[in-house]
């Protein structure tokens, strides 16, 4: 760790700031978010200037196009981020809500309430929107947050954090509610992972390597957000046009995100009707197909298909989260084979089935243990905003505390309040 960084100095400041926020009203916290939303638009030019520098450096280093897309901001994206802050303002405040309660035989009034976590740490890759999402969700739920974004987005993140801190300070709250260790690079990330007692929970968001490092090395409790090796399975008898729309959307709408499809499984019955059309449209969109033998044989007979985009799939392809215009495609003989393939290779994020059969949909749902199952819908819907949670801080693929898109409620813990009239235990 750098001698210039004392992580517990940052966490102590965060804790002091969070104690004041924890006693604030919903209106006050919404006021902070409104100030942030406005500040993002007001400082748009400054943010874009910093982002342009990051994007130029990323391209010069040969970063993949999909990852550069995740990094890049423009005025429309900044306005969309600002608008998403307003959406979070409109969400119900979880702090203080009653989870359950009642009276005991001893006459005690017992209530379990939602309360803030405290200080949350976020370690994530080069996605500037996460800087804003993490900040506003933590603040709305009464938490402070310490951020470590990817080095490829350092100028953008530092500018965003400065804008957010200024907005918080303008309303009389401590700017230390949002801090960053980005100036210390990887030393900052390692310090966060060792800040047990200072950071209450650590949330990594990024690729498999980043998440594994945090999970294995952190002494701070971790909520694991998994990688997105997402599957789409096209069942026998599925609506061909709908299935084609779904795989095109799931793969190509935005390739550098964790809910993009990475593997397409096709029931053998659907090879004549579905697969040629799907391959034609996927390759027309520029998708490189990593195909098993049956898929390659089908592709060879599809007219006007760019055969240079078809290659033989390897074992690694079934395990890969591409985050690019690549898709692994396999023909299966049954839904059972599709389920077994997904069980073996899935990261536990999102799996989709295209089917006309209720029993097949139920079998798929019951036999796959992923955080989200989509039936006749794109994998791209596994998103906090799409599911009515507002902005999300990540998508958890673990089972403890939170699973799936993590919204406001998942950024709280609980407190038991026991009220009596001089009661003592017998």
Short names for language-model regions:
Residues 1-110, 137:
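N-terminal Rossmann-like NAD(P)+-binding subdomain of aldehyde/semialdehyde dehydrogenases
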Residues 26-30, 95, 171-178, 253-260, ...:
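Flexible, glycine/charged-enriched surface loops at secondary-structure junctions
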Residues 84, 97, 268-378:
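NAD(P)-dependent aldehyde/semialdehyde dehydrogenase
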């Amino acid at each position: 760790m750098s001698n210039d960084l004392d992580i517990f100095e940052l966490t102590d400041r965060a804790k002091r700031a969070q104690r004041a926020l924890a006693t604030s009203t919903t209106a006050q916290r919404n006021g902070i978010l409104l100030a942030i939303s406005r500040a993002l638009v007001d400082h748009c030019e400054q943010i874009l200037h910093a982002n342009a520098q990051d994007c130029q450096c990323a391209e010069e280093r040969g970063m993949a196009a999909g990852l550069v897309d995740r990094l890049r901001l423009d005025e429309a994206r900044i306005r969309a981020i600002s608008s998403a802050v307003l959406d979070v303002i409109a969400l119900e405040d979880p702090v203080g809500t009653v989870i359950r309660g009642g009276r005991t035989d001893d006459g005690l009034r017992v209530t379990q309430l939602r309360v803030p976590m405290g200080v949350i740490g976020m370690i994530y890759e080069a996605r500037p929107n996460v800087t804003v999402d993490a900040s506003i969700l933590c603040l709305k739920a009464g938490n402070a947050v310490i951020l470590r974004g990817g080095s490829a987005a350092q100028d953008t993140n530092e500018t965003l954090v400065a804008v957010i801190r200024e907005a918080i300070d303008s309303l009389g709250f401590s700017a230390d509610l949002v801090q960053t260790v980005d100036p210390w690079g990887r030393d900052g990330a390692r310090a966060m992972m060792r800040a047990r007692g200072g950071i209450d929970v650590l949330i990594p968001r990024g690729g498999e390597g980043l998440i594994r490092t945090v999970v294995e090395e952190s002494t701070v409790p971790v909520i694991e957000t998994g990688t997105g090796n997402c599957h789409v399975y096209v069942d026998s008898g599925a609506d061909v046009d709908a299935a084609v729309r779904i795989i095109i959307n799931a793969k190509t709408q935005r390739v550098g995100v964790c809910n993009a499809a990475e593997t397409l499984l096709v029931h053998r019955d659907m090879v004549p009707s579905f697969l040629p059309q799907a391959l034609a449209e996927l390759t027309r969109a520029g998708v490189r197909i990593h195909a098993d033998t049956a898929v390659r044989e089908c592709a060879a007979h599809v007219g006007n298909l760019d055969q240079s985009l078809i290659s033989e799939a390897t074992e690694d392809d079934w395990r890969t989260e591409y985050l690019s215009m690549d898709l692994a495609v396999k023909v299966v003989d049954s839904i059972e084979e599709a389920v077994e393939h997904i069980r073996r290779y899935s990261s536990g994020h999102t799996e989709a089935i295209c089917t006309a059969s209720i029993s097949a949909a139920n079998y798929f749902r019951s036999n796959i243990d992923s955080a989200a199952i989509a039936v006749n819908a794109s994998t791209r819907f596994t998103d906090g905003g799409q599911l009515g949670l507002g902005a999300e801080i990540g998508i958890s693929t673990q089972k403890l505390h939170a699973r799936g898109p993590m919204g406001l409620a998942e950024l709280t813990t609980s407190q038991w309040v026991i009220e009596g009239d001089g009661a003592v235990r017998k």
